[in-house]
Amino acid sequence: MEGQTRSGSARPGTRTGLGPLPGTHGVLQAEIPSKKVNSSFQLPAKNSGPASSEPRLTLAPVGPRAAVSPPSERPRLVLSSPRPVLAPLSIAGEQKRPPPPHSSNRAAKSVGQLVVSAAAASKPPPVASVSILAPKSLGQLVISASAMPRPSPAPLGSVLTPTSRDQKQLSPTSVGPKPALATSGLSLALASQEQPPQSPSSPSPVPSPVLSPSQEGHLAAASVTSTPASERQLPARQKDTAVPRPTPPADKCLYTPERAAGPATSPPRAQAFSDPRLSPSFRARPEAPRHSPEDPVLPPPPQTLPLDVSPGLPESGTRSPGLLSPTFRPGIPSSQTVPPPLPKPPRSPSRSPSRSPNRSPCLPPAPEVALPKPVTQAAGSGRCPSPNLQAQESPAAATTTTSPTSSWSAQPTCKSDPGFRITVVTWNVGTAMPPDDVTSLLHLGSGHDNDGADMIAIGLQEVNSMINKRLKDALFTDQWSELFMDALGPFNFVLVSTVRMQGVILLLFAKYYHLPFLRDVQTDCTRTGLGGYWGNKGGVSVRLAAFGHMLCFLNCHLPAHMDKAEQRKDNFQTILSLQQFQGPGAHGILDHDLVFWFGDLNFRIESYDLHFVKFAIDSNQLHQLWEKDQLNMAKNTWPILKGFQEGPLNFAPTFKFDVGTNKYDTSAKKRKPAWTDRILWKVKAPSGGPSPSGRESHRLQVTQHSYRSHMEYTVSDHKPVAAQFILQFAFRDDVPLVRLEVADEWARPEQAVVRYRVETVFARSSWDWIGLYRVGFRHCKDYVAYVWAKHEEVDGNIYQVTFSEESLPKGHGDFILGYYSHHHSILIGVTEPFQISLPTSESASSSTDSSGTSSEGEDDSTLELLAPKSRSPSPGKSKRHRSRSPGLARFPSLALHPSSRERRGGSRSPSPQSRQLPRVAPDRGHSSSSRGSSEEGPSGLPGPWAFPPSVPRSLGLLPALRLETVDPGGGGSWGADQEAPDPNSLSPSPQGRLGLEEGGLGP
């Protein structure tokens, strides 16, 4: 009632009087003292709103009289107006609070509003005369107000007023938005030169130089009447917002009485709302739905902030992609609009995450508020920063994507999401041994899940590849790979893929909870040394689809020396042309949505001599060397480099140093320093069609967060270089192919039951299996136990498997379950960490099987089997005879090496408590002990299977080693007089009859 009383007094007093005003130009000054002419129009004004409670205060004029001739187009305004001026007045007064008192500038802007409504409004002749005179009087009032000295702002804030459509700003003296006009979607004006600083509600009135109270009352009725007509400039869904709504949330967002008190300047309209969700620092929380499709409340009109978080139901075809709310997805049923809350790994033991829980919703707000729209240029945000910027880890604005329950989400990401973060590292190690610590090189941050990267690509060159070293690396994991796996494992990173070509290695890691959304992983390599016959030079690559976007990582080692620039160009073209990938996605390297090209590219600095280069480095004038860098020059001349981008070279050249120091080459050769180690990226230009993943052309944006070298590592003559990138996806394909369900805790062996649901598009294989991993596992084969995924249907597309008691780890710990797909060669479904608390007192009895063989005295030299051509713990694909272990996909090409986890005492065998090799009974359909799971295999045969006679007794891997297989004839059990072989001995069994339990060779 208070707002209505104040606004009611404003209408007849200050804003728009309802009395007839003379229609000619010269009558205005003569009619000012007279109030009798206006008396006939006071009754409609009273009917349209409450009576005036403070008429004298609202009649206060602003400045001295200034007679100005009105515009000539105002009379034409009346002739085109078919609508009565006072018709909608009662509607606005019934449902909305009338505008509070305002200065004469308000009347002038209301007449501007009247101009908009006059083209389509219908007014009778008596009202037409009022409309003719009102603009004239207000024109004089505006000019006189702008010409006079401005008093201090009024204690009561004025109201936002709509003006012409081309004005998009606010009045600096306005404090709160006007409810009746904010919902209509009209633009707000910032007219500091024309606005009187004192409100009509000021307690110190001054004589009116222009209008009488009744004449101002006329203008108030006309301005209020013009509001519905101006709404025709808006879309249909915004017209509806002008209809009064009694909903409290809308009132709170549109008007706050507290902010109308006090002389405060108003922020822009998008920030003037009292709702904290609309403030620039507000972080949209993914788990809090913005609106529901059933909500009848419509959103406000487009604002300066690109994120629309007001409640409302978007009508089809009326909402632009740039204004999509974080939870709006076109074409998705209403029940799928609200995403489930993000899981927070690794502490909430629950179910399989349906998406990548990469970000906690409680992140601090990003410093930047502006959010790039999905339709912006894909490579626009990836431009190089200014050269004067230091390559430091400055914060970058990024975005988050909520996870839907549909197959993909098409909404723009939220402001609070730091995006998908990728760290790329390149290092020419110069055949050196790995250092002790690489934490700073990998930018792992504080170890918190919200710090650091989501994916890390590591490219190494000149890894020791001598014959004896290569033979050792063929049997054992190379030391560099072990170093990075050991360093990244505690940070929840898992090795996704790796490829090696002599001394060139590429390792790709990702957080374990991203694995279900990384698909179609493939590798390739190209030799360019000695005409393509030697792999000391060339390139290795890993490509994959991350959340539906095709990414490719290319690690190259190109020819050296100053005069080999053209040869480097030819080698790069050869690598791009020869490396092709299979599948429906991108085939060539440049066909991917995003390509990272890095390595020891060996580009040098031309023209300048050694002394000038060192002087520029010592004086920190690196920009003088940029224009003579061969790669920078090649970007402008080589067509093959079109579209590749690189950050500023704000770090010193990374080659060549004396090993063990930070001094440049002091040998007799005195090599000139150069930026040989580089990291570039290229975003595929939008072609107007779908991306290789089948989505829209505007797919992602790339921003380089940092680009620097690491001078603290001195083991090589090169310094490692690292770059951090932030990827902002326009959509995320974030639905796992398999969802695993498990209890929060396994306190008894009977609880070791796993249920999983598969998507209809998932191509299952009989080689699929489910592994049990400790938190911090290093790669997909680093499991504690496993069970074959037999796909026995339980309910619809829900399946169930059970881990045997013998395969379960004893004691207490945090574990993760993962579904390994043979076709995808990666975990396509994982759970959140859960607890296993099994009593350790049962370990002795459970570790003894029916053969009576004790596991005491067994050493920790469990052998891990790898295909010799594979640098990944994952075995190569094969269609040969099936093994009982997921680690044995093929037999003729197996290699042995002890696992580092075994050296630490952990079990790598799928059955940690029964690793003693028992004798297999003659009946090949039964076994004396269970392996992995006591249930039937995928083929329906009970228990573990025996090897067929075609498997040789000795695999001939090493002269001193011979692996015994199950006796094809079955044999008999151990007799009382037979001596069991020493399990610590690797020599062949003298009896030659020790059976090898099937699957015992598994990793």
Curated annotation (Swiss-Prot):
CDD domains: INPP5c_INPP5J-like
Keyword flag Ribosomal protein: no
PTM-bearing positions, type Phosphoserine: 171, 292, 325, 900, 987
GO biological process: negative regulation of neuron projection development; phosphatidylinositol dephosphorylation
Residue span of region Catalytic: 422-725
A molecular-function term among this protein's GO annotations: inositol-1,4,5-trisphosphate 5-phosphatase activity
Compositional bias per record (Basic and acidic residues), positions renumbered to this chain: 284-294
Motif extent (SH3-binding): 346-351
Annotated keywords: Cytoplasm, Hydrolase, Methylation, Phosphoprotein, Repeat, SH3-binding
Modified residues (Omega-N-methylarginine): 56, 65, 83
Bias (Polar residues): 160-174
Compartments reported by the entry: Cytoplasm
InterPro entries given in the database record: Endo/exonu/phosph_ase_sf, IP5, IPPc, SKICH
Catalytic activity: 1D-myo-inositol 1,4,5-trisphosphate + H2O = 1D-myo-inositol 1,4-bisphosphate + phosphate; 1D-myo-inositol 1,3,4,5-tetrakisphosphate + H2O = 1D-myo-inositol 1,3,4-trisphosphate + phosphate; a 1,2-diacyl-sn-glycero-3-phospho-(1D-myo-inositol-4,5-bisphosphate) + H2O = a 1,2-diacyl-sn-glycero-3-phospho-(1D-myo-inositol 4-phosphate) + phosphate
Low complexity bias spans: 11-24, 180-196, 349-361, 390-413, 840-855, 907-919, 927-943
Compositional bias (Pro residues): 197-210, 338-348
Pfam families, per the entry: Exo_endo_phos2, SKICH
Region of interest: Required for ruffle localization: 726-837
Record family assignment: Belongs to the inositol 1,4,5-trisphosphate 5-phosphatase type II family.
Domain notes: The 5 Arg-Ser-Xaa-Ser-Xaa-Xaa (RSXSXX) motifs may constitute binding sites for the 14-3-3 protein.
PANTHER family: INOSITOL 5-PHOSPHATASE (PTHR11200), PHOSPHATIDYLINOSITOL 4,5-BISPHOSPHATE 5-PHOSPHATASE A (PTHR11200:SF127)
Designated name of the protein: Phosphatidylinositol 4,5-bisphosphate 5-phosphatase A
Gene source species: Mus musculus (Mouse)
